[in-house]
Regions:
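Active-site acidic/histidine proton-transfer and metal-coordination neighborhood
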Residues: 14-17, 21-24, 54-63, 73-170, ...
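Glycine-rich, positively charged N-terminal anion/phosphate-binding segment
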Residues: 42-58
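N-terminal substrate-binding region of glycoside hydrolase catalytic domains
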Residues: 27-45, 68
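A generic structural signal for short coil/turn motifs at secondary-structure boundaries
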Residues: 40-43, 114, 178-181
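Active-site beta-loop-alpha junctions enriched in small/polar residues
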Residues: 6-10, 34-38, 69-72, 108-110, ...
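Short, N-terminal intrinsically disordered low-complexity segments that are rich in Pro/Gly
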Residues: 9-13, 43
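Histidine-acidic metal/acid-base catalytic patches
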Residues: 1-4, 12-27, 150-253
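Structural preference for beta-strand elements that scaffold enzyme active sites
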Residues: 2-7, 30-32, 61-68, 100-104, ...
Length: 253
């Protein structure tokens, strides 16, 4: 496995050149770029920037792990769902142009007026449509285990079963909540999603989440991808990232 970062908070104000230089300096090997932040990798970016972005990542040795979108498919209003599917397809096209491995999407809640099983199926079918577009473009879809109620691994399992597309995987999100961590362990919840895991977010490694168990289970499942730090910003990002990498490496021992 390798250490990377999500620019949701840490790194969000960095332009792409600064971000890649900081990652290279601190030993971070992969990046998920949160969209709408300072990096400039967005829908509508000039086509001339596509190759430039791809080259910048290639020259840096840092992998563009994914584009972190807020596309979601749980809405009751089907027009909203359709709009999110079509926007996901646009992100997929951009990901292919700039050399990103994947596109991160999410569930973001479960409407109370709709049966959970129906919403899970709706999300899964939307993911399957996006998965076909992703396969055609040579990228992946990463479904983040996210949202109130919808982050329950049992529900995400239902979404993935309804999806059933090889280009769609799960982004394990290291949620320290009772749906995921049971009696201090993820031994019963991790297996629900392990066969689909294609990405992984990690948070503050100083928290009481079972980090050693997570890293062991990831390795045992055959996962050899990035574990992406999604942590608060710092006035000294490079200094924080060095300490974070040291702690991450200690957990691998």
């Amino acid at each position: 496995m390798k250490l990377g970062m999500v620019t949701y908070e840490l790194g969000k104000a960095m332009d792409l050149k600064t971000l890649l230089a900081t990652c290279r300096e601190t030993g971070f090997k992969a990046v998920e770029l949160r969209t709408t932040h300072a990096h400039g990798v967005e829908l509508g970016m000039p086509e001339a920037k596509w190759a430039e972005t791809k080259t910048m990542f290639a020259d840096s040795g840092v992998e563009l792990w994914g584009l972190g979108t807020v596309c979601e498919y749980h809405a009751v209003d089907q027009a909203v769902v359709r709009r999110n599917i079509e926007q996901t397809k646009q992100w997929i096209e951009l990901a292919a142009h700039v050399g990103a491995r994947g596109v991160k999407v999410r569930p973001n809640g479960m409407p109370k007026e709709v049966a959970q099983e129906k919403t899970c199926e709706q999300i899964g079918l939307a993911l399957a449509e996006c998965g076909k577009a992703a396969a055609d473009a040579g990228v992946l879809i990463h479904l983040e285990v996210h949202g109130a109620v919808s982050s329950n691994p049992k529900l995400c399992q239902k979404m993935m079963e309804a999806c059933d597309h090889p280009s769609v995987g799960v982004c394990w999100n290291s949620n320290n909540n009772p749906d995921e961590v049971i009696n201090g362990s993820i031994a019963t919840t991790f297996p629900l999603l392990s066969k689909w895991i294609k990405s992984c977010h990690i948070t503050e490694l100083s928290s009481n989440y079972p980090w050693r168990e997570l890293f062991r289970l990831l390795k045992e499942s055959g996962y050899d991808g990035a574990t992406l730090a999604e942590i608060p910003a710092s006035a000294e990002p490079a200094r924080l990232m060095r300490y974070y990498r040291a702690l991450w490496e200690a957990y691998q021992a």
